[in-house]
A protein has these predicted regions:
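Catalytic histidine-centered segment of alpha/beta-hydrolase-like enzymes
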Residues: 288-298
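Conserved alpha/beta-hydrolase catalytic His-Asp/Glu region
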Residues: 176-230
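Conserved serine/cysteine hydrolase catalytic core
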Residues: 209-275
Length: 311
């Protein structure tokens, strides 16, 4: 884990943006690091059942690196996708889909641009967050994505991984302590790669909410599992074909971080991503599956260098 993890630091700022949905509106939370007046914004978006605080170490490191390199200040924004973390839940479970998520992020970008004109926009997306990034990178945004980081995700998601998601997504559990919750999460997250107990506890503490009786549960709407369980192989294949069309429209420099042991993203898919669309650069993380947590210094440095935030 990065040495920055040991430095005392203030918590990031928490804010909200109102986003439309089929039943009205909902509030989406986002965490901000760095200078709110910065014109260079890096958006980091998490995986399916995670939340924005997954990027604490990466965000702190990127902000510090820009300062150390005497580069213009940056702002790192890490949203909680609707239904996760501090964001509100949707009334209709079937509204948890990528069109909704991408629309929410477009609203967020519009809000950030109104606060301070964005001149440079970069995107770091883990798994689901990477798919959202691909959808936006293929669109003519007011400020186009300058550089796109896809963390162990592409147009192809293996059917075995989808079956695995069907088994656990939506099971928020009930735990008597943070340690109990962390232990349970580790059982389904070992593919994230080696972490010390301290590192894993740090990643877990923002993943739980307190119930009325004092017990803990995972901090997301169990209903996000409903559309996951509704996915058939035919729907998955159609989604894959559509995402390849999206990927082929991406023109910005793209970095694919690939967990060498990933069950979700195959080597053949990685090779196709190197040949199609933006012809992604690939950084392979040995000993890690789906997905690298971007909390260890070697992983952080890959992102830092691709975004040009190193001395």
């Amino acid at each position: 884990m990065s040495e920055l993890a040991l430095d005392p630091v203030l918590d990031p700022a928490l804010d909200f943006v109102s986003c439309p949905d089929p039943n009205g509106t909902h509030r989406m939370a986002y965490w901000s690091w760095g200078e709110s007046s910065a014109s260079h914004v890096v958006v980091c978006v998490h995986g399916l059942t995670r939340q924005g605080r997954d990027f604490d170490l990466l965000a702190r490191s990127l902000v510090a690196s820009a300062k150390k390199a005497n580069l213009p200040a940056i702002r790192v924004v890490c949203p909680d996708v609707v239904g996760r973390g501090q964001s509100e839940w949707l009334k209709d479970p079937m509204a948890y889909h990528f069109a909704q998520y991408a629309g929410d992020m477009a609203v967020l970008l519009q809000s950030l641009h109104a606060q301070q004109a964005i001149e440079r926009l970069d995107w770091v997306g883990t798994s689901m967050g990477g798919v959202i990034g691909m959808l936006l990178a293929a669109q003519p945004l007011p400020t186009p994505i300058r550089r796109l980081v896809l963390n162990d995700i592409g147009p192809v998601v293996s059917w075995a991984s989808i079956l695995n998601m069907k088994n656990y997504v939506g099971k928020v559990g009930r735990f008597q302590s943070l340690q109990d919750a962390a232990n349970a999460m580790w059982e389904i997250s070992k593919s994230f790669g080696p972490h010390t107990s301290e590192e894993w506890l740090a990643l877990s503490k923002h993943m739980v909410r307190t119930l009325e009786d004092g017990a803990l549960a995972l901090h997301y709407d169990p209903a996000i599992g409903v559309p996951v369980r509704a996915v058939t192989q035919e729907k998955a294949q159609a989604g894959e074909a559509a995402l390849w069309q999206v990927y082929d429209l991406i023109a910005c420099p793209t970095l694919l971080i690939h967990g060498a042991l990933s069950e979700l993203l195959s080597l053949s898919a990685v090779q196709d991503m190197q040949q199609r669309g933006p012809r992604a650069q690939v950084a392979t993380i040995q000993g890690v599956g789906h997905a690298p947590t971007l909390t260890h210094e070697d992983q952080i440095d890959i992102v830092r260098r691709f975004l040009g935030l190193h001395a």
